[in-house]
Curated annotation (Swiss-Prot):
Part of the 30S ribosomal subunit. Forms a bridge to the 50S subunit in the 70S ribosome, contacting the 23S rRNA. GO terms for biological process: translation. This is Small ribosomal subunit protein uS15. GO terms for molecular function: rRNA binding; structural constituent of ribosome. SUPFAM superfamilies: S15/NS1 RNA-binding domain (SSF47060). Residues 1-21 are annotated as: Disordered. It comes from Syntrophotalea carbinolica (strain DSM 2380 / NBRC 103641 / GraBd1) (Pelobacter carbinolicus). HAMAP family: Ribosomal_uS15_B. Gene3D superfamilies: 6.10.250.3130, S15/NS1, RNA-binding. Keywords: Ribonucleoprotein, Ribosomal protein, RNA-binding, rRNA-binding.
Amino acid sequence: MLATEKKQELIDQYKRHEGDTGSPEVQIALLSERITYLTEHFRTHKKDHHSRRGLLKIVGQRRRLLDYLKSNDVERYRAIIKSLGIRR
């Protein structure tokens, strides 16, 4: 799981205004961090299929948020893709 400090750091980096925790950029950044953490987890725990299902759910959620952002504001979409280094 994400440490509180790391989570707050990501929120501060991607927030759109003060007190923002729910904008698509923040949500995508937090989900990307969890995906990275789980990917590392699976390198050592190859048979953890139960958690792998959760990873696929998180990846799908991030994809839906990215699709939403792409359809509403392409510039913000391109900025978040570039800053997180997501292949799309």
